[in-house]
């Protein structure tokens, strides 16, 4: 049968328990459902084959008329577009404004990358084609990346260094000192946000990173040498790290310390990046 019986297994067991047997013959309800199914199959529309000779097309003259009308409508729309007043002056002024804003945004992104990038192989950041041309021509030096701290104590130092909060970006006016014409003369990507020059350079082959602090340079050079001087003092733990902030973050796993607290709720986290991910839920 195409339709399953409506009675459940519990009803079948009840019938067997009461009568001692179960009849396999279909009931009136099952006959009725089977009849409804057969009627639906019989009455539904079936796909039929249509030969190509039965397909009717419009007359050839009607087709040509439709094509000519469509062509005329297209020409009229083109004439309307061409008769509209020129907007070259508006486009040029908007383009110049976009160039200025893009240059400001590229400077902000390059400076903010100094405080957020982990120690890694040399990477060049170019936010637009104009920046790429300047880098290739030698007007800009290589990308400058500093070591971002992950512990809350050093985060305070970095926020004081920038003169703003941990989650705030410096304004373009603070980052760009002087006009756009003078920025090429100072030429450099060697100037730090607070005005000091980056004098500590990595001398390993192929690496051109520059830092303002010798401690940051030493921490970076350990990525080349593989040195890990910071050892976990927890009993039974022999983990070693190249940077002190990595050891601090690892040590919180033993102590269970969670110094990063959410300002919207009472949840605390042991790492600042975990707190940043959690804060996105409140947005």
From Swiss-Prot:
**Biological process terms in GO annotation:** cellular response to endothelin; cellular response to hydrogen peroxide; cytokine-mediated signaling pathway; positive regulation of connective tissue replacement; positive regulation of transcription by RNA polymerase II; regulation of transcription by RNA polymerase II
Q: Where in the cell is it found?
A: Nucleus
Would the keyword DNA-binding turn up in this protein's UniProt record? Answer: yes
Annotated C2H2-type zinc fingers sit at: 200-224, 230-254, 260-282
Main location class: nucleus
Locations of Basic and acidic residues compositional bias?
A: 183-196
What the entry lists under CDD domains is as follows:
KLF6_N
**Which regions are flagged for Low complexity bias?**
102-113, 133-148
Q: Which Gene3D superfamilies match?
A: Classic Zinc Finger
Disulfide links within the chain = none
Task: Give a yes or no for keyword Disulfide bond in this entry.
Answer: no
What Pfam families does this protein map onto? zf-C2H2
Disordered: region residues = 102-198
Motif 9aaTAD — list its residue ranges: 62-70
Q: Which UniProt keywords apply?
A: Activator, DNA-binding, Metal-binding, Nucleus, Repeat, Transcription, Transcription regulation, Zinc, Zinc-finger
Q: Which GO molecular function annotations are given, in alphabetical order?
A: DNA-binding transcription activator activity, RNA polymerase II-specific; DNA-binding transcription factor activity; DNA-binding transcription factor activity, RNA polymerase II-specific; double-stranded DNA binding; RNA polymerase II cis-regulatory region sequence-specific DNA binding; sequence-specific double-stranded DNA binding; zinc ion binding
Specify the domain of life of the species encoding this protein.
Eukaryota
About its domains, the entry says:
The acidic N-terminal part may favor interaction with the basic domain of transcription factors. The 9aaTAD motif is a transactivation domain present in a large number of yeast and animal transcription factors. In KLF6, the motif is inactive.
Query: What family is it from?
Result: Belongs to the krueppel C2H2-type zinc-finger protein family.
Give the multimer and partner information: Interacts with ZZEF1.
UniProt protein name: Krueppel-like factor 6
The species this protein belongs to is Rattus norvegicus
């Amino acid at each position: 049968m195409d339709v399953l019986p409506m009675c459940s297994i519990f009803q079948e067991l009840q019938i067997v328990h009461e009568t001692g047997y179960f009849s396999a013959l279909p009931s009136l309800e099952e006959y009725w459902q089977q009849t409804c199914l057969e009627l639906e199959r019989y009455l539904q529309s079936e796909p039929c084959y249509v030969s190509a000779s039965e397909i009717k097309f419009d007359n050839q003259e009607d087709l040509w008329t439709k094509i000519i009308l469509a062509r005329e409508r297209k020409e009229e729309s083109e004439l309307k577009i061409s008769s509209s007043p020129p907007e070259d002056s508006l486009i040029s002024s908007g383009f110049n404004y976009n160039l200025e804003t893009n240059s400001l945004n590229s400077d902000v992104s390059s400076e903010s990358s100094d405080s957020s990038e982990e120690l890694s192989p040399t990477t060049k950041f170019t936010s637009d084609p104009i920046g790429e041309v300047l880098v290739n021509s030698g007007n800009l030096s290589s990308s400058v990346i500093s070591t971002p701290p992950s512990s809350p104590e050093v985060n305070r130092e970095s926020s004081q260094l920038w003169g703003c909060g941990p989650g705030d970006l410096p304004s373009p006016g603070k980052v760009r000192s002087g006009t756009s014409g003078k920025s090429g003369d100072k030429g450099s990507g060697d100037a730090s946000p607070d005005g000091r020059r980056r004098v500590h350079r990595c001398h390993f082959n192929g690496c051109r990173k520059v830092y303002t602090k010798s401690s940051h340079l030493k921490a970076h050079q350990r990525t080349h040498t593989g040195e890990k001087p910071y050892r976990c003092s927890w009993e039974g733990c022999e983990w070693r790290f190249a940077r002190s902030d990595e050891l601090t973050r690892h040590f919180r796993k033993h102590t269970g310390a969670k110094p990063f607290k959410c300002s919207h709720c009472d949840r605390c986290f042991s790492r600042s990046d975990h707190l940043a991910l959690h804060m996105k839920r409140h947005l």
